[in-house]
């Protein structure tokens, strides 16, 4: 009788999972960075993970006179330019900030939230596919200049100060990304 019951329930559960997987609201919403779209990321989860980590890390960021994500970097970014800029910033955060901050996060015991944030940044970045078309060259150059402004400021700081500052500004990055988030 148990085998018969399992055989009846299993197809029903499979169907329910299949249907739930097709409902966009349950998968996460969508980022639309100009021509680049990313689905399956739930922005509130990113915010929650960030605040969990930042509440611990914030005490480390004592340099309030410098801002890495300046208005010149993030304001008035065209939709087309947003794909390139988001890709560059997320790649930098993953390869530089998160990579070098990992050991501190382990000490602070917020690895789960940090991993949620890093893994979602990786998913978003890997799905962003900026066009390599020559017609897009002026747009990609503009995004590159914005990123270099950020990167130069980062490089001018002591590495530990720069890492704390960059991590402390993830909320600025998330707020900017939220402008491209579709429900």
Curated annotation (Swiss-Prot):
GO cellular component, one term: extracellular space
Disulphide connectivity of cysteines: 36-83
Gene Ontology terms: biological process: apoptotic process; cellular response to interleukin-4; cellular response to lipopolysaccharide; immune response; negative regulation of cell migration; negative regulation of cell population proliferation; positive regulation of apoptotic process; positive regulation of cell population proliferation
Signal peptide stretch: 1-28
UniProt keyword annotations, A-Z: Apoptosis, Cytokine, Disulfide bond, Glycoprotein, Isopeptide bond, Secreted, Signal, Ubl conjugation
PROSITE patterns in the record: INTERLEUKIN_10 (PS00520)
PTM statement from Swiss-Prot or TrEMBL: Glycosylated.
Compartments, record wording: Secreted
An example molecular function term from Gene Ontology annotations: cytokine activity
InterPro entries, sorted: 4_helix_cytokine-like_core, IL-10/19/20/24/26, IL-10_CS, IL-24
Residues that carry a glycan: 76
Primary subcellular site in the record, as a coarse category: secreted
Record keyword tRNA processing present: no
Transmembrane segments: none
Family named by the database record: Belongs to the IL-10 family.
Chain's role: Multifunctional cytokine mainly produced by T-cells that plays a regulatory role in immune response, tissue homeostasis, host defense, and oncogenesis. Possesses antiviral functions and induces the type I interferon response during influenza infection. Signals through two receptor complexes IL20RA/IL20RB or IL20RB/IL22RA1. In turn, stimulates the JAK1-STAT3 and MAPK pathways and promotes the secretion of pro-inflammatory mediators including IL8 and MMP1. Intracellularly, maintains endoplasmic reticulum homeostasis by restricting the eIF2alpha-CHOP pathway-mediated stress signal.
Protein's name in the database: Interleukin-24
